[in-house]
Swiss-Prot record:
CDD domains reported for this sequence: cinA
Similarity comment: Belongs to the CinA family.
A Pfam family recorded for this sequence: CinA
InterPro entries associated with the record: CinA (IPR050101), CinA-like_C (IPR036653), CinA_C (IPR008136), Competence-induced_CinA (IPR008135), MoaB/Mog-like_dom_sf (IPR036425), MoaB/Mog_dom (IPR001453)
NCBIfam families hit by this protein: cinA_nterm, PncC_domain, PRK00549.1
Gene3D superfamilies (alphabetical): CinA-like, MoaB/Mog-like domain
Organism expressing this protein natively: Mycobacterium sp. (strain KMS)
Entry protein name: CinA-like protein
Domain of life: Bacteria
Length: 421
């Protein structure tokens, strides 16, 4: 039987939804990569009684490892370490070496500031150097150290900020205490296929057929997710079940090959960035208000290929900034393929790019008509060599959904245009 784990995400701000939980899903993925079965993810506030209740619940479920995130700071409501110590039956002790390391970090953070009482600050942070007796201390990334407390179950305590938690995780998995806790793990492989342009119902039908016809299908653990208008198919399996996965992949290619854009989990954003090497791109956006250009520039190194972007929400801006003829808008409407093409042409000329993408649409909630309801979005990808692709789609969802899905459609139109040479 595989080792089992549970996750406790702490923080009233997470529990109430003011802050989105990024740690639980991230830790879950890392556990699955290690071959550890995830039993539960729980979220609770900062009260020690609530944290301890979650720890006891997971222990009663028979998990081998509990991972907590949050509550390691110097303030009064940061009580996770003390709660874990009590749960594990360990005394809190002052680690003087850790206290000095934290003091050194604080001194570097303060720099030359003279308006802060360093001794008072150090005393306030002494709490972070109190660790459960017998625990393995994980070097702080910020000022908060993590700890691994061996036992049944073993408890790994990590800080809340993802920028601190993620590098600390890599250290934690190398500790003897954690490796011992997950020693019973089963080795798994995990593969991801990404699709675009296929309805979930089409994929569901194929998976039903695979379940009926593929020998060994029950050895594959498959999860599907619709994200940003794309379908993700994640398959986890033991190494000797790889032939079964290969048969499934062959079936997916045979039925939905045109929809598959990634068999290694790579994002369309990564693919577009690679395809733009040696080229430059410009964007012209209306209803998405710069979301496409933001997505393009999220990638490090995007300055090598992003020439410029224009957000032309008003019709007058389309005319003045991109040179879209006013009579074209009058004849066809701002949300039309001719206007999208003119916007792309204007962006191409204004920024001197090799390729341009334009988006114009009705995101809602108002503005729709019988002929052009809310969700109608027009796209154009134009190349400097004269090749052009235009599309009109009707996207479901609310305003936010339409805008986000529009950027995804644009990225895939761009990907296909660039792949065509």
């Amino acid at each position: 039987m595989s080792a089992r784990a549970g996750i406790v995400v702490t923080g009233t701000e997470v529990l109430t939804g003011r802050v989105q939980d990024r740690n639980g899903p991230w830790i879950a993925d890392r556990l699955l990569e290690l071959g550890v079965e995830l039993a539960h993810i729980t979220i609770c506030g900062d009260r020690p009684a609530d944290i301890e209740a979650q720890l006891r619940f997971l222990a009663a479920e028979g998990v081998d490892l509990i991972v907590t995130s949050g509550g390691l700071g110097p303030t009064a409501d940061d009580l996770t370490v003390a709660t874990v110590a009590r749960f594990c039956g360990r005394e809190l002790i002052l680690d003087t070496e850790l206290e000095q390391r934290i003091a050194d970090i604080l001194r570097r953070l303060m720099g030359r500031r003279t308006d802060v009482d360093f001794d008072a600050l150090r005393a306030a942070n002494r709490k972070q150097a109190m660790v459960p007796d017998g625990a393995t201390v994980l070097e702080p990334v910020g000022t908060a150290p993590g700890v691994v407390v061996p036992g049944s179950p073993t408890v790994l305590v990590l800080p809340g900020p993802p920028r601190e938690l993620q590098p600390m995780w890599r250290t934690a998995v190398q500790t003897e205490a954690l490796r011992s806790a997950i020693a019973g793990r089963t080795e798994y492989r995990q593969d991801m296929v990404r699709m675009f342009g296929l309805p979930e119902s089409g994929l569901a039908e194929t998976l039903r057929d695979a379940e009926r016809d593929l020998a060994g299908f029950d050895r594959l653990e498959i999860t599907t997710c619709l994200r940003r208008g794309e379908l993700e198919i994640v398959t986890r399996y033991e190494p000797d079940a790889e032939p079964v996965y290969r048969n499934l992949l062959t079936l997916l290619r045979d039925r939905h090959g045109s929809a598959i854009f990634s068999e290694d989990g790579s994002l369309v954003d990564d693919q577009v960035a690679a395809l733009l090497a040696g080229h430059t791109i410009a964007t012209a956006e209306s209803c998405t208000g710069g979301m496409l250009s933001a997505r393009l520039t999220d990638r490090a190194g995007s300055s090598a290929y992003v020439a410029g972007a224009a957000v032309c929400y008003a019709d007058a801006a389309k005319v003045e900034l991109l040179g879209v003829p006013a009579d074209l808008i009058a004849d066809h409407g701002a949300v039309s393929e001719p206007v999208a093409e003119a916007m792309a042409d204007g962006a191409l000329r204004r920024f001197g790019a090799d390729v341009a993408v334009a988006i114009t649409g009705i995101a809602g909630p108002g503005g729709g008509t019988e002929l052009k309801p809310v969700g109608t979005v027009c796209f154009c990808v134009r190349r400097a060599d004269g090749r052009v692709v235009t599309r009109t789609v009707r996207l479901p969802g609310d305003r936010s959904d339409v805008r986000e899905r529009s950027t995804t459609v644009a990225m895939h139109l761009l990907r296909r245009a660039l792949q065509d040479g």
